[in-house]
């Protein structure tokens, strides 16, 4: 599994989908699973964080189906916290993890992208909450992943979809 990680607006789903297509893997997106399920609309419409145990259940039920089939996954979004890492590790997720691609995008660029994407839960307060949440959780998440032996590879997420994807593909070829 290759995990694509970054804040809201960094291009996780765009790059995850494209990468899965190029590598012939299954694409799973935490954000898309959440939006498609509609079980979490009360949280997402306000920018509130979904309780971690509920979120992990949703992620695991979808990941397990892919791992049981072939295990070749590009996953974007979560886990977003140390607590989620621990819960997912109990499910055996990280024995499948090759490395994490961390998309680095400045906040001004994130806000510019978010303003043009057109999702119904998009508004500036929700975006700022999501960016703040990522900033608060990402450092400890990345430290925990490194502690567990998972390689973290930073990629400049600024540029066209094709430019960013080319950077990621070069990184994959090196690893």
What are the roles of these predicted feature ranges?
Residues 1-175:
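Glycine-rich phosphate-binding loop of ATP-dependent small-molecule kinases
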